[in-house]
UniProtKB/Swiss-Prot annotation:
Name assigned to this protein: Methionine--tRNA ligase
PANTHER family assigned: METHIONINE--TRNA LIGASE, METHIONINE--TRNA LIGASE, CYTOPLASMIC
Catalytic activity: tRNA(Met) + L-methionine + ATP = L-methionyl-tRNA(Met) + AMP + diphosphate
InterPro entries per record: aa-tRNA-synth_I_CS, Anticodon_Met, Met-tRNA-synth_bsu_C, Met-tRNA_ligase_1, Met-tRNA_synth, Methionyl/Leucyl_tRNA_Synth, MetRS_core, MetRS_Zn
Organism, as annotated: Burkholderia thailandensis (strain ATCC 700388 / DSM 13276 / CCUG 48851 / CIP 106301 / E264)
Gene encoding the protein: metG
Recorded GO CC terms: cytosol
Single Gene Ontology MF annotation: ATP binding
Length: 718
């Protein structure tokens, strides 16, 4: 089923011209854009550009997600108001998106009058329809800051494995989920105080209402991605299971956001007004351009609406958001497209290794944004698979594909054409069999882009580029140019080469828009669209002098980029330590600790005797098999050879840092005499050792210990 099958073209639109609203998830307004974020914005932008090139009426909408406790606390830390913070961050985000060619039709903010009005309207419609309930709940409360604490703002000791400094909802070591009240020795991340329990009246969206379940079961059947459909069916359960829980949509003051109508001191939870921000940004655009906003969002609208998101927020976009829209009288999304996460060189992005790369640092290092656009596109497909930015492969692929195969075609032909033929192509050569092959491939390449199979589109394009280069190598224009008698053959070769280059540029335009602009200027042609595949270069229009369109990646640029991002961690933490205190020095102490990647929280661990240490049996283990644990976002299941008659089974909370295939064959260190523990996924017969920073927020990353290659399974560590 195609998108046009789901939503036919609106009455009054030109035949075949679709009306499309597309969004990316809203970046949170308390930090910088990094390359992990850019995966999604580049993916969406390529799709939006593809649809524009078809001539469809499409609007790519975005905004900063500005509300919530983290923004409020970040502003307090910086000594500014939340509004001052989000205004500054908006400018930074807009700069970064512009740098990478992300072509929003409107990039707005959720802290707007439009968003407040729309959020209130949707809430009141849901309330009138019987979907809002009020009930008393008990929460953790910080007595020092006098505020209720979200789960992620409480830390303590895991009640299961007793790992320290775990969040209030789940343990990152053993993968157990729990309530904040289950933590041992809990403390507030904000002030360090011990939380107390307080009750408060909260507002809930009744997702458990049978009407919601019935609607969502029908709506899920239209999702394009099988992984998303399967996940939703897992959340919904079988008919009659009633697995959906009501959703808490309110927060207590102090809170930066919109106050709930008729409920003083209560605010909309950020995840209610954030998706409404899609519509608010579009409404702002409609008012400026004279578009009929209601015709796009009303329940009977026949326009199309697509959301590109990360797979980590699928729950919000496939349960809450469509249900909110359905029962408040609005149209629901045509589809939701989720992508995977980004790793760098096979591991989670790391500040200590310099692979936590910000968008601005990439630009500052002098790297071309279109290199990254191309590399990400080459890795992306229509699934939710994670993608890896391998920096050596990045350099090799850009240099080989974009410079060696693509722009090299123009540089080999343009000089001869200008010098020998006044820059004009040979009219009869534009129907060469090679060019027919390229023209015939353009619709398929465009279809790959629309289906979000960017990797396929680029593989096909580079295969065509290989064919063109093969043609040039066989024709040898540099040899033909030596003899005036070969003028006709030379003219034909240069014409075929340059027309082929035009067609390759058309195929690459959604990915390389700035290069495409340069090509259009060089060839003296109007902006390329898919319909231009059959409009060859005119012999009446001379080309202009060739200008370099792309340079090679210099490995020194990559080295400088990594070094800059390593040093930025030190600089940011030092600045925080110097300027950010909360009266008792807790914030400064924490920041100073983050500035030293090797620092550890020594004072939290009392001394033990050598006899105590001798009780721990540390052994070398070889990972002979590894797999993800179904139903867990954090655990990997390891099969370990520890020199015994049979292997051991161990569950480890390291999924965020490693792909299973990366670990197979590695040696590591395990606690061999840890009592076996029965988990819901099976029996864990030990623990592998891993290292992480004391302040994981300032320096994320998890690293298993790897002994010297001379060590063998079963050897004791002593």
């Amino acid at each position: 089923m195609s998108a046009s099958d789901l939503h036919p073209v609106q009455a009054g639109a030109p035949q075949g011209r679709r009306q499309i609203l597309v969004t990316s998830a809203l970046p949170y307004a308390n930090g910088q854009i990094h390359i992990g974020h850019l995966v999604e914005y580049i993916q969406t932008d390529i799709w939006a550009r593809t649809m524009r090139m078809h001539g469809h009426e499409i609007y790519y909408i975005g905004a900063d997600d500005t509300h919530g406790t983290p923004v409020m606390l970040r502003a307090e830390q910086e000594g500014v108001s939340p509004k001052q913070l989000i205004e500054r961050v908006w400018r930074e985000h807009k700069r970064d998106f512009d740098s990478f060619g992300v072509s929003f039709d409107n990039f707005y903010t959720t802290d707007s009058d439009e968003n407040r009005v729309l959020s209130e309207k949707i809430y009141l419609a849901l309330k009138e329809a019987g979907f809002i309930a009020e009930r008393e709940i008990e929460q953790a409360y910080d007595p020092v800051k006098q505020m209720f604490l979200p789960d992620r703002f409480i830390k303590g000791e895991c009640p299961k494995c007793h790992a320290k400094d775990q969040y209030g909802d789940s343990c990152e070591v053993c993968g157990t989920t729990y309530q904040p009240t289950d933590l041992v020795n809990p403390y507030s991340v904000v002030s360090g105080a011990t939380p107390v329990r307080k009750t408060s009246t909260h507002h809930f969206f009744r997702l458990s209402d049978p009407r919601c379940e019935a609607f969502l079961r029908e709506w899920v059947s239209g999702l394009a991605q099988p992984e998303a459909t399967n996940k939703m069916r897992e959340w919904l359960g079988d008919a009659g299971e009633a697995k959906l829980a009501d959703w808490d949509i309110s927060r207590d003051a102090p809170y930066f956001g919109f106050e709930i109508p008729g409920a003083p001191g209560k605010y909309f939870y950020v995840w209610l007004d954030a998706p409404v921000g899609y519509y608010a940004s579009f409404k702002n655009l409609c008012e400026r351009r004279g578009l009929d906003f209601d015709a796009w969002i009303s329940k009977d609208s026949t326009t199309e609406q697509y959301h590109f998101i990360g797979k980590d927020i699928l729950y919000f976009h496939t349960l809450f958001w469509p249900a909110m829209l359905e029962f408040s009288g609005h149209r629901t999304p045509t589809n939701v497209f989720a992508h995977g996460f980004l790793t760098v060189d096979g591991a989670k992005m790391s500040k200590s290794r310099g692979t936590f790369i910000t968008a601005q640092s990439y630009i500052d290092a002098g790297l071309n944004p279109e290199w990254l656009r191309y590399y990400f596109a080459a890795k992306l497909n229509a699934t939710m698979e994670d993608i890896d930015l391998n920096l050596e492969d990045f350099q090799a692929r850009v240099n080989s594909d974009l410079v060696g195969k693509y722009v090299n075609i123009a540089s080999r032909a343009a000089g001869f054409l200008i010098k020998r033929f006044d820059g004009r192509v040979q009219a009869s050569a534009t129907n060469h069999p090679l060019l027919v092959t390229l023209r015939d491939a353009i619709p398929q390449i465009a279809a790959h882009y629309e289906a979000r199979e960017y990797g396929r589109a680029l593989r096909q394009t580079m295969e065509l580029a290989d064919a063109v280069n093969g043609y040039v190598d066989t024709a040898k224009p540099w040899e033909l140019a030596k003899d005036p008698a070969n003028a006709v053959a030379l003219h034909e070769t240069c014409t075929v080469s340059l027309e082929a280059f035009r067609l390759l540029s058309l195929a690459l335009k959604p990915v390389l828009p700035r290069v495409a602009e340069g090509v259009e200027a060089f060839l003296g042609i109007a902006p390329l669209t898919w319909a231009d595949a059959n409009k060859p270069l005119s012999s009446e229009q001379p080309i202009r002098a060739y200008q370099h369109l792309m340079t090679r990646v210099d490995p020194k640029q990559i080295d400088a980029l990594l070094a800059a991002n390593r040093s930025s961690l030190q600089g940011a933490a030092a600045a925080d330590a110097a300027g950010a205190t909360n009266g008792n020095g807790a914030k400064a102490a924490k920041s100073a600790k983050a500035a030293n990647a090797a620092s550890a929280d020594d004072e939290a661990s009392p001394f033990i005797s050598i006899d105590d240490f001798a009780k721990i049996d540390l052994r070398i283990a070889k990972i002979v098999a590894c797999q993800a644990v179904e139903g867990s976002d954090k655990l990997l299941q390891l099969t370990l050879d520890v020199g015994e008659e049979k292997t051991r089974n161990v569950f480890s909370g390291i999924k965020s840092a490693y792909q299973p295939e990366q670990l197979v064959g590695k040696l590591t260190v395990m606690v061999a005499n840890l009592a076996p523990r029965k988990m819901k996924f099976g029996l864990s017969e030990g623990m592998v050792l891993a290292a992480s920073a004391a302040d994981e927020k300032a320096e994320p990353g998890l690293y298993i210990l790897e002994p010297h290659s001379g060590a063998k399974p079963g050897m004791r560590v002593k």
